C-alpha cells in the first residue's frame, strides 16, 4: 500500500500542470520559483540547511533546477518520545487552532503547550483500602523501608535499564523539504537514527509524531529522489497551504496592530511584527531568524526589514522568500520532540 501511495504521489507531483502564477498571499501556496527563492533564503540564513540533487536525472522534477531538487539538514537531535501519555516537562495539552474562517477541524492544526494554565497538576493523597472496601487513614511510609541506594547488596536498590533502547534515549533525524507540486507547497520527510547511528525502523519514527497527526496525516513512504528505496515518515501536504495562510494572515494582523500602536505613540519600532505568528505556533522562538536578518549590510535590502510607516497597508509581515522559516515552525508543532530550532542556528 505504501509503495502504491508513494508511486502515485511521485507521478502526481511530476505530471500535475505547473503553475507559475503567485497566489502566495491569497492561498498560502507557492510556485516552484518561490520554493527555490525560499530555499535560497533558508540556506543563506541557516547554513545547517543545504540544497541537494536527485540521485539520477530520471528522479528529478523537471520544473526545479538541477542541484536544487530538495533541501536537507542532518543530525537533528530528538531526546524524548511522544506516546499516549506524553506530557512534556510539566504536562502538555493539545489544542486545535482553527483557520481564520472557523471552519471544520481539518482546516486547523494542533499545537502542544503547557497545560498548567487550564489544568493544574495535583498530587493526590494515597490511602489504604481494606478487604471490605473501607478507606483507611493516609499511610505514612517509614524511612527505614526506603531502599538505600548506596547498598550494593540490596536488590531493591538496583535500578535496571530497559532491555530495548530503541524507544528511549537520544535519536537524531535527517530532515528533507521537497516541493509538492500537486498541492503547491513544501512537504517534509524525516529519517531517524538510533543513538548508535543505526537507522531507526520506520514504524518507530511514529513515536516522535504528535498523536493526532500520526493517526491522520503522517505516512511512511519512499523518498522520491533516491534511486534505492528508503522509507521515511512524511507529513502529508494536503492541509499545509491552509495552515500557512492562517499563520501569514495572523502575522499580518499582528504587524498592522503594532503599526497602529506606533502611530498612537504606544509602541516601539525596533521589534518585528511577528507577535501573533509566534503565539499561534506554540510561542516558538523565531527571534533568531530576524535577529540575523536585521544585520543586513548597508546598501542591501534588509531581510525581515521593518516596512516604512508611510507605505500602503497591504504590505505584509512575511515575504515569500521567508516562507520556509514559518513552515518549519509549523512542522515543529507536529514533531515537538525533534529540535527543529537546532537547524536554525548559525
Curated annotation (Swiss-Prot):
Residues 242-322 are annotated as: Handle region. One of its GO terms (biological process) is protein transport. It comes from the Eukaryota. GO terms for cellular component: cytosol; mitochondrion; phagophore; phagophore assembly site. The keyword Cytoplasm applies. The active site is at residue 238. It is found in: Cytoplasm. GO terms for molecular function: Atg8-family conjugating enzyme activity; Atg8-family ligase activity. It holds the Pfam family Autophagy_act_C. Transmembrane segments: none annotated. Keywords: Autophagy, Cytoplasm, Protein transport, Transport, Ubl conjugation pathway. Residues 85-161 are annotated as: Flexible region. Monomer. Interacts with apg-6/atg8 through an intermediate thioester bond through the C-terminal Gly of apg-6/atg8. Also interacts with the 40 amino acid C-terminal region of the E1-like apg-5/atg7 enzyme. Also interacts with the atg12-apg-4/atg5 conjugate. The N-terminal region is involved in phosphatidylethanolamine-binding and is required for apg-6/atg8-PE conjugation. E2 conjugating enzyme required for the cytoplasm to vacuole transport (Cvt) and autophagy. Required for selective autophagic degradation of the nucleus (nucleophagy) as well as for mitophagy which contributes to regulate mitochondrial quantity and quality by eliminating the mitochondria to a basal level to fulfill cellular energy requirements and preventing excess ROS production. Responsible for the E2-like covalent binding of phosphatidylethanolamine to the C-terminal Gly of apg-6/atg8. Belongs to the ATG3 family. This is Autophagy-related protein 3.
